[in-house]
Amino acid sequence: MSGHGAPEIDPTALDGTGLAVTVVAGRWHDEISAGLLAGAQRVLDAAGVTTTVIRVPGSFELPVVARAALDAGADAVVALGVIIRGGTPHFEYVSDAATSGLTQASLLTGKPVGFGLLTLDDEQQGLDRAGLPDSKEDKGAEAAEAAVTTALLLKAIRGA
């Protein structure tokens, strides 16, 4: 499992009071997407951040909306999406574009983007990572924890 060695998430240890975090979540593969979103919201609620959720059609739309949220004042974004490999190059195009775009949004704004974009070979891999009752991992929660932790680190570095 890809999560081997991942740190334990203790959302109660995060104090994100005063932070504004936008969750940008794709709509494809609803059961997996809903699990990712629930995990992210659980961590953000426990951290005490002000949260806005924006649903986008798919993963390709994540970067432009993430960038807009950061430009509009969000301290961080949690990007959630699901891309499952099929029989055409579409998987590679969308995965690469979304990943590159999210990286650019973060670097150009100087604000964190928690990366909760699952790129999968099959649906079961997504179910295993979606934070559902039978899941082994919770990538939505991990992405939210990364976004809040990094936003707090950047505030400390910048003396804000």
UniProtKB/Swiss-Prot annotation:
Chain residues that bind 5-amino-6-(D-ribitylamino)uracil: 28, 59-61, 82-84, 115
List of residues binding (2S)-2-hydroxy-3-oxobutyl phosphate: 87-88, 129
CDD domains named among the record's database cross-references: Lumazine_synthase-I
One Pfam family it belongs to: DMRL_synthase
Protein's UniProt keywords contain Ligase: no
Keywords assigned by UniProt, alphabetized: Riboflavin biosynthesis, Transferase
EC id: 2.5.1.78
Principal EC category: transferase
Active site: 90
MF annotations from Gene Ontology: 6,7-dimethyl-8-ribityllumazine synthase activity
Pathway(s) it belongs to: Cofactor biosynthesis; riboflavin biosynthesis; riboflavin from 2-hydroxy-3-oxobutyl phosphate and 5-amino-6-(D-ribitylamino)uracil: step 1/2
Catalytic reaction equation(s): (2S)-2-hydroxy-3-oxobutyl phosphate + 5-amino-6-(D-ribitylamino)uracil = 6,7-dimethyl-8-(1-D-ribityl)lumazine + phosphate + 2 H2O + H(+)
Listed InterPro entries: LS, LS/RS, LS/RS_sf
Gene Ontology annotations of biological process type: riboflavin biosynthetic process
SUPFAM superfamilies reported in the protein's UniProt record: Lumazine synthase
Gene Ontology cellular component terms for the protein in this record: cytosol; riboflavin synthase complex
Gene3D superfamilies: Lumazine/riboflavin synthase
Function: Catalyzes the formation of 6,7-dimethyl-8-ribityllumazine by condensation of 5-amino-6-(D-ribitylamino)uracil with 3,4-dihydroxy-2-butanone 4-phosphate. This is the penultimate step in the biosynthesis of riboflavin.
Protein family (similarity comment): Belongs to the DMRL synthase family.
HAMAP family, alphabetized: Lumazine_synth
Protein's UniProt name: 6,7-dimethyl-8-ribityllumazine synthase
Organism field: Clavibacter sepedonicus (Clavibacter michiganensis subsp. sepedonicus)
Upper classification of the organism: Bacteria, Bacillati, Actinomycetota, Actinomycetes, Micrococcales
Gene name in the database record: ribH
